[in-house]
Amino acid sequence: LNSGTKLSFGQDFFFKFYQAFLLKDRWMQYISGVGTTLLVTALALALGVVLGSVVALVRVTHDQQRPGHKNAVLGFFNAVCQVYTTIIRGTPMMVQLLIMSMVIFANSRNFTMVGALTLGINSGAYVSEIIRGGLMAVDPGQMEAGRSLGLNYMTTMVVIIIPQAIRAVLPALGNEFIILLKDTSLITVIGGKELLYAAQGIMNRTYEAMFPL
């Protein structure tokens, strides 16, 4: 097109669409970004569920100890878990990403994995409270019934308590997945090449924001 050429609305619309998606196969950059976004979300959710489950079990087990039978080691780990959830839930995700990428993993160039790790650690703090709430929502009589049948504490938790808690926490875990999916856009600030990163790159080349975003 010549400089200053006047385009109709339809021509302008198609030209901007062509620039953003078809020119130089730019649509492939979006596909790559979507793949990275889903990968980061899956890794972060897996880490968050594992970490959150461990933290929740430690805290629930500590809280259910009988008076006079407190375990010092369990008390220490419970305190660590409380500090972890308080700090992670009380600081912005952006700050956590910057600390992980510029301080802890300052020499790493794998920004996608650093982003996934950070999101997973962040998610773990929230998932732990979701799972802890689900475990505490189970009728205490269920634990007493399991123990009266001769099952030890861990067996009762695995066989009786946790299966009931899972049903209660599934909707909240679904919400956490959606939140993680949206939060992946933040890893752009540390160089993670997800969907927003791809869109920004194309926007910087075409000087057009509507279609890339």
Question: What label would you give each PLM region?
Answer:
Residues 1-213:
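Transmembrane alpha-helices and adjacent helix-loop boundaries
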